[in-house]
Amino acid sequence: MEPVTYEPIGVVESTFSKPEEVPRPSEEFVDASGTVHIEPQYEPGLKGLEEFSHVVLVSHLHRVEETRLRVTPIASRGEVGIFATSGPVRPNPIGTSIVELGGISGTELSVSNLDLVDGTPILDIKPYAPKMTDLDELEIGWMG
């Protein structure tokens, strides 16, 4: 298989300096605010994003130092595979975060409910629209 390479489109400015400072979603609500700084050449791609209340940040979890294929989530009944979780210790440390979009000023996005460490590279931004993914029958495995 050919290697895959991505260039970040921006970086996160956050109050969290270490991964262990970020609250785990299953333990408490993440109420941190921050800024996503987008590289100037990508500013035209932000047009229309201000119409959404929430966005999905796709990130490279640059501070993750290990990979595990089996983990024990707090809310689970035991060990599960990493692909059955949203945990960060993945073979490819790619994260997705749904954040509230407070506003856009030039190449800066003000966001809240941010669960990323300061300096996290952003690979992509997508509007969050639950109706696009609303499924009639949804099984949520051990999370249910």
Name each model feature, range by range.
Residues 1-144:
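Glycine-rich, low-complexity intrinsically disordered segments
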